[in-house]
């Protein structure tokens, strides 16, 4: 009996290794075909990391050298940062610092006179759900038209928020109007009730409470030996950390970098909550984060496919791509991070997603 169990264990281990090797080969093939220098991916359940791997090179210029990818390499999350900002907002609601229906101008009455009256009733939840009508600020052209703001990051974001609230709102019949800028205004509310900057809140929750590593901004701005982002100019090239590219005004919407190990842990906390388990947040808070609105909840876009509810998000600053898909019905998550922000790389990412889901259904 013992021999049979040992034989079964060896067979099972062999099958797992074979599946991992197979998916690694397919990842390498996709990366070559779609010019992706480095990729990290994971499949996660509430109680298990099914697979997790990082492969490739930090820079396209190193592509003919020995691979230097490391499992702890950081990737820029882009707009997948929104789920982290939403998570922190959820944490503040549980600390009784703020409520989802808190109105912005009840916290900042001094800004009301100079703001557009159509914004008078906007709430924290509406800002995080893209239902407050805030202008999008999803393109560089919008930022180039801004006046010059003075001070540190927090002061500049506050001035940015004041400016945003003077603009006409986005008004149409869409279920939501995606806005990076709306998250900057939401962050201002979170800062007001906590007495801390958004940056301090991220450190409190991610680093101090959850023991997760992260960086703000591009990985290579913290360490040159981390992955570099890539864009086409017109050929694919790595983007130097000294490049004039500043996302600080919309940092709460899209400027955190994490490695696949710690980002997977963060996603796993969300899966546990969706499975009904309390952790740093209560299960009911996770339900609100994911399901408080049909089309776009708090940091997550929602869709129903074949009677299964999915939440997903794609993040990019134009140099990296980050994608996470969560099957709420199981729940299970698929995560793919790459250091190329081109449309071609995005096609490769979604092609690999199909392969990953087929290998680990």
Regions found by a protein language model. Name each.
Residues 312, 322-340:
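Short, well-ordered beta-strand elements
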Residues 57, 116-318:
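Short, surface-exposed loop or secondary-structure junction motifs
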Residues 75-78, 176-178:
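Catalytic tyrosine of NAD(P)H-dependent dehydrogenase/reductases that use a Tyr as the general acid/base
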Residues 21-75, 97-99, 165:
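Short, conserved catalytic-motif segment at the N-terminal edge
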Residues 99-115, 209-210:
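Short, glycine/proline-biased beta-turn/loop segments that scaffold the active-site neighborhood
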Residues 305-309, 340-361:
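Short, gly/Ser/Thr-rich active-site loops of penicillin-recognizing serine hydrolases
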Residues 24-27, 41, 47, 76-104, ...:
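Active-site SXXK
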Residues 1-23:
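Bacterial Sec-dependent N-terminal signal peptides
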